[in-house]
Amino acid sequence: MCIRDRNGIVLSTDNYYKTGLISKLLPKFVEGFFDRNISFNSKLFKKDFDFIYKNGISICDRYYNFEKKTIQSILNETFNISFLIVEGIFAKEFSNSLNNNDYIFLEIKTKKNECMKRVVLRDVKERGKDKKQAENDFLKSWSIYYEKFKPDSIKKNRNKFIIEKNTDIDQILKKLFN
């Protein structure tokens, strides 16, 4: 199995939040704003996704600045893209909007406490939150996410894998890249 000959790219939904007044005001009034659809710039994300999918190239990388509530575009041309990875809190929802089955959905199941440690560390370091706020925001977003996505809420796709601690990753990789 050789994946080094394949060129891939990762689109993180974390880099596609809305900007401007919406993202500055609404978080003050809407609990868990950044974990809800209203915060996600789905139009821009879909535009980038479709361009990469159709053309096999990417022109720039996008980065969301949580303190300034802006998206920075950095020129970074990538050619001959043969696979595209979508990751982030809106990935599952986005996969439900795809019109074809030309994708593989991987969901990594983690324990709530393990996930919270990782997210709190990220939020303190990258999003300028204090630890208590990051913990409270995580608990709210965990509830929002699991309310929204009951088991099997993803549309039926034979290429859906749920990865847990005891999952045989080699089997999944063989199916993905052979």
Where are these regions (language model features)?
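Short, small-residue-biased leader/transition segments that mark boundaries at the very start
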Residues: 1-3
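Short beta-strand-centered segment that lines the nucleotide-binding/catalytic pocket of NTP-utilizing
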Residues: 6-23
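Conserved beta-strand scaffold positions in the cores of enzyme catalytic domains, especially
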Residues: 8-10, 103-107, 160-163
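Conserved nucleotide-sensing/catalytic segment adjacent to the nucleotide-binding pocket
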Residues: 18, 23-68
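Short, charged, surface-exposed secondary-structure boundary motifs
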Residues: 20-21, 115-120, 172-174
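ATP-dependent NMP and nucleoside kinases share a basic, alpha-helical "lid"
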Residues: 71-128
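NTP-dependent small-molecule kinase module
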Residues: 79-81, 121-124, 143-178
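An accessory alpha-helical subdomain
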Residues: 134-137, 141
